[in-house]
């Protein structure tokens, strides 16, 4: 049995599978006799914050730290290093954020409260999308994996900017000042070629507390810390960035994201009607993900190639691009996260319907995206 468990965690798709399981368990519990206990647990206060708050602001800061590390590595030595390799996924990502947001706004423009959720379908769940792609194993060209990874990373970077600009509450000048000082300290450490990770993490913890108290969303501290970690070590040392990225990845994939999914996907269907499910808010979210993502990514990619602005990566055709663009409609954890920022406890009914829209759109995108990708790829060689 232990060998089976070990083999499971070695699978590329394991993280995505765990996300599905965690979300499914949460939905079952939330709609059972244990539903009240589930909600009571999430709203239990520990050290001044609810369990839900610790997960969304604390654990997710670690997830965003990993995103920061990945983005920096890709910018310095990966798929985003040169203009030639970065421009195609960058253009695709812009389309993939713009079209879903516009579809959502088209459905909800006359509701001032609902319009706050315009960014919900703009996000892509990188772990889930890569997990679905990994189910097809070696049939997937490396260049297609790199395209999806680069696109999703740029998408995540866009989400970080959106959170910073549009989903930050009343700001505390003192806390912000401390945050800016700690940001300066982190990058000064980098400039002085300090490579000891513990120093960055202690400074980063102080930054996280300052950002948490400032009114800017605390997860952004994770991105700043990630960008401050040096890529290159001193002579004879391993890369601090790669070391931390490698160390964090299993915890994020197999613990943090499943815990986040469990804490946020448990939606009680009590009182939810068919009329509510087909109302403008969930429809805007679901169609933004399921239709907006492929429409934006594919059309912007096609236009970029036809106008000579970018080239298709080697070994990839437009059938592959369309299949991947549908997969990018899996918003799931990232979309749920933005929904909690847009509506949260202030408008729980809107948050519930937004999350139902996320589940509908993401599930449809996952099933169709997998099917299209499977059809577009060559059969596995014997």
From Swiss-Prot:
GO MF annotation terms: sodium:proton antiporter activity
Disruption phenotype: The growth of the inactivated mutant is not restricted at various pH and NaCl concentrations, although it is inhibited in the presence of LiCl at pH 8.5.
GO CC field: plasma membrane
GO biological process terms on file: regulation of pH
Activation and inhibition: Activity is regulated by pH. Active at alkaline pH.
Keywords from the UniProt entry: Antiport, Cell inner membrane, Cell membrane, Ion transport, Membrane, Sodium, Sodium transport, Transmembrane, Transmembrane helix, Transport
Compartment annotation: Cell inner membrane
Protein's membrane topology: Multi-pass membrane protein
TM segment ranges: 14-34, 47-67, 87-107, 117-137, 146-166, 171-191, 205-225, 247-267, 271-291, 296-316, 321-341, 353-373
UniProt induction comment: Induced by sodium, lithium and potassium.
Pfam families the record matches: Na_H_antiport_1 (PF06965)
UniProt cross-references to InterPro entries, sorted A to Z: Na/H_antiporter_dom_sf, NhaA
Superkingdom of the source species: Bacteria
Catalytic activity entry: Na(+)(in) + 2 H(+)(out) = Na(+)(out) + 2 H(+)(in); Li(+)(in) + 2 H(+)(out) = Li(+)(out) + 2 H(+)(in)
HAMAP family reported in the protein's UniProt record: NhaA (MF_01844)
Role this protein plays: Na(+)/H(+) antiporter that extrudes sodium in exchange for external protons. Can also transport lithium. Contributes to the survival of V.cholerae during the stationary and exponential growth phases in a saline environment.
Family: Belongs to the NhaA Na(+)/H(+) (TC 2.A.33) antiporter family.
Protein name per Swiss-Prot or TrEMBL: Na(+)/H(+) antiporter NhaA
């Amino acid at each position: 049995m232990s060998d089976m468990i070990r083999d499971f965690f070695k699978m590329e798709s394991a993280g995505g599978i765990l996300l599905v399981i965690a979300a499914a368990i949460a939905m079952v519990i939330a709609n059972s006799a244990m539903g009240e206990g589930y909600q009571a647990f999430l709203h239990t206060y520990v050290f001044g914050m609810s369990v839900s708050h610790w997960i969304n602001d604390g654990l997710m800061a670690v997830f965003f730290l990993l995103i920061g590390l990945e983005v920096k590595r890709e910018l310095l030595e990966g798929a985003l290093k040169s203009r030639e390799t970065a421009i195609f996924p960058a253009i695709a990502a812009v389309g993939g954020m713009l079209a879903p947001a516009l579809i959502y706004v088209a459905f909800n423009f006359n509701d001032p409260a609902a319009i706050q959720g315009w960014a919900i379908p703009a996000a892509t769940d990188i772990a889930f999308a890569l997990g679905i792609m990994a189910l097809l194993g070696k049939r997937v060209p490396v260049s297609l994996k790199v395209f999806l990874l680069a696109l999703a990373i740029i998408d995540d970077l866009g989400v970080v900017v959106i959170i910073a600009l549009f989903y930050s509450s009343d700001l505390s000048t003192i806390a912000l000042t401390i945050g800016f000082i700690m940001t300066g300290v982190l990058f000064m450490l980098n400039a002085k070629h300090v490579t000891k990770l513990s120093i960055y993490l202690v400074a980063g913890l102080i930054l996280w507390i300052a950002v948490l108290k400032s009114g800017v969303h605390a997860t952004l501290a994770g991105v700043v810390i990630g960008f401050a970690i040096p890529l290159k070590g001193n002579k004879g040392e391993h890369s601090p960035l790669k070391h931390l990225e490698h160390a964090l990845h299993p915890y994020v994939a197999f613990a943090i994201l499943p815990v986040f999914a469990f804490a946020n996907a448990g939606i009680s269907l009590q009182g939810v009607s068919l009329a509510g499910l087909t109302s403008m808010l969930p429809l805007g979210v679901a169609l933004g993900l399921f239709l907006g993502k492929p429409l934006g990514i594919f059309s912007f990619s096609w236009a970029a190639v036809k106008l000579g602005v970018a080239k298709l990566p080697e070994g990839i055709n437009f059938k592959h691009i369309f299949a991947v663009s549908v997969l990018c409609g899996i918003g799931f954890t990232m979309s749920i996260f933005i929904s909690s920022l847009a509506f949260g406890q202030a408008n729980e009914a809107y948050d519930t319907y937004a999350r139902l829209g996320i589940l509908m759109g993401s599930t449809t995108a996952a099933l169709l995206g997998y099917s299209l990708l499977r059809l577009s790829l060559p059969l596995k060689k014997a």
